[in-house]
Amino acid sequence: EQARTALDAWVREVIDWHFDPATGCPFWLDRAKTLGWDPRREITGFGDLRRFGDFEDEWLRGGPVHRWVPRGLAGRPVFVFETGGTTGIPKTRINCEDFRVDYELFSLTLPDEHFPKGSNWLMLGPSGPRRLRLAVEHLAQHRGGICFCVDLDPRWVIKLIKKGWNEHLHAYKDHVIDQAL
């Protein structure tokens, strides 16, 4: 019961913030106008969230990305992340600083014998516009190391596969591995 009470209080706080004209983002403020009810008055806990219906993936495709930036975070750095775009126009989402907190907490779960503090890391993966590079880079820095990144472009890999250009695919794989070594 205590967890439910805390969850409901947190939901009310989040709804109040995101639907307040002073702090909310244009997307949710515009969405509120189409609902026919006021989320700040009628969402009183987690169970009420179903009133919004399903979140549509299509809302995340295309721009402008500023529609997702809350007014309450105006002036703060914004990071833009995208999906790989393999199912159409890439889905875009924004993040401010909270990914850093997420990965600092995640760092607590990493055993030091496998992720020694103060050691440098090598990341071979998509560098942008994905969250992964920033996440791994911050995690390495948080643990006292430096992250060296080798970019792997999954969109290019998928195009090579779809075209059946296996020779180019293997050449790209060799190129990426050579950079890592």
Where are these regions (language model features)?
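Nucleotide 5′-phosphate-binding alpha/beta core
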Residues: 1-82, 88-120, 126-129, 137, ...
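Short, intrinsically disordered, charge-balanced linker/junction segments flanking boundaries
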Residues: 170-181
